[in-house]
Structures are given as structure tokens and as C-alpha cells.
Regions:
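Phosphate/nucleotide-binding beta-alpha loop and adjacent structural elements of enzyme active sites
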Residues: 1-221
């Protein structure tokens, strides 16, 4: 995706910080059998939380990031992490995956969406909402959550650069059956917050804001 403003803000001005102390405080209390990391990227969440779970499923479709993710897992001897080099979405098959043009950052802003609105809220120093239009893309395998995971998950984290609702649609079976105990979603458009709350409240989740920007919402109790 050719959006140098996003790259400049995220990595140089730190306006889009990937980690939040408040989030880690919440997550560090959780223990369980399975953590599903949707949009694992280089494995920050997967690796850091892996000691708290028997199994971690890390979903990452970026063909440049996957080898680095596997290397990081190997270097830290995290044998309970399984990497799935596919994108979770609302269907099964192949799809265009639009690339972050700044290869030096290994595509942290890659997305299944060709048009991606970034409007996360009151981030410190952030300018007005802006939209990215994908130019370069690769074909990647996609699948629904329901087609990939049958067991119950103690925690599901979703960070997929605007494609959050496609992932949730593809997980409707697991949500219906109560096979997702806790969920955390990084929402990239604050105008969609009410939709997120509405969808997840149907399944009994009581979401709360987990960071001060706001962009991360979850039900972690």
C-alpha cells in the first residue's frame, strides 16, 4: 500500500504504537489452552503470550513476514506455536493481498482491503482520517475461522488492518457455539465501533476500550 504518511507516522512519530501497557496488563493475566493470533505479523503477541497457553495458532498471510515469524519462533524455542500462512476472512479460496510498499518494514500495513480507511480516534498528534488505496498485491490463500479451528479458544486477537468484520463473519459458527471465550480486536476505523459492539454483544461479549487512543477493544474477563 503506497501511503508514506502512515509509514512516517507509525514508525518515526510513533503515532500508531503497536503495543500498549494497558493491553499487556490485561493480557498477562490470561492463561488457557489455545490462543489464536489473527494477523500475527512478526509474532509479538504470539511469542510473548505463548508461555501462558498450551497452544498458539498464528495466522499471517504476508509472504515476506512468514519466514521472519518462523525464525523468531525458532530463535525463542516456542514449540507450542503453529504458523498458518493464510489470511482469515469470510470465505475460503484465494484473494488479493494488498502490500505495504515500504518493504523495509515487511508489510505491517498489508490488508485484504484495496481501500482501507484509517481513522482510529484521538491518537496523540494524529491528523485527520486518511484512506489508503492498494496498488501492488499478491494472491494469498484465505479461509474462514470456522473452517480452520474446531476447538475452543481461550483468547482470540484480531489485527488485520481494516478486515476485522470479515474475520468475525467467518467465525460466526465459533461465536454462536461459544468456542471463543475472550476476544480482542484492533479497530482501524472509529466510526465502525458501534458496529463492532453490536456484533459481539449478540454473542454475549461486553467490550471495553483497552487503550487510550482508542483503537483496541476487547472482552477479556
Amino acid at each position: 500500500m503506497r501511503d508514506w504518511r502512515f509509514i512516517f507516522e507509525k514508525y518515526l512519530l510513533r503515532k500508531h504504537p503497536p503495543l500498549e501497557p494497558q493491553v499487556w496488563t490485561e493480557l498477562s493475566r490470561i492463561r488457557g489452552g489455545l490462543f489464536v493470533d489473527v494477523g500475527a505479523y512478526l509474532g509479538t503477541y504470539s511469542v510473548r503470550l505463548s508461555p501462558h497457553f498450551r497452544h498458539v495458532y498464528a495466522f499471517e498471510p504476508n509472504p515476506s513476514a512468514v519466514p521472519l515469524l518462523r525464525k523468531r519462533i525458532e530463535e525463542r524455542s516456542r514449540r507450542n506455536i503453529t504458523v498458518f500462512p493464510i489470511a482469515l476472512s469470510d470465505s475460503n479460496g484465494l484473494a488479493r493481498f494488498y502490500l505495504d510498499a515500504h518493504q523495509g518494514f515487511n508489510g505491517s500495513a498489508d490488508t485484504l482491503l484495496q481501500v482501507f480507511k484509517y481513522n482510529p480516534g484521538r491518537q496523540i498528534g494524529a491528523g485527520p482520517a486518511h484512506t489508503y488505496v492498494g496498488k501492488e498485491c499478491v494472491m494469498v490463500p484465505i479461509a474462514t475461522y470456522d473452517s480452520q479451528i474446531q476447538e475452543a479458544a481461550d483468547l482470540v486477537k484480531i489485527d488485520v488492518e481494516g478486515a476485522e468484520f470479515q474475520v468475525l463473519k467467518g467465525a460466526s459458527g465459533a461465536l454462536d457455539e461459544g468456542r471463543i471465550r475472550r476476544i480482542m480486536v484492533e479497530l482501524h476505523d472509529k466510526d465502525a465501533k458501534d458496529d463492532l459492539y453490536k456484533i459481539l454483544s449478540r454473542y454475549g461479549f461486553k467490550l471495553k476500550q483497552l487503550d487510550p487512543h482508542p483503537r483496541i477493544f476487547g472482552s477479556l474477563a
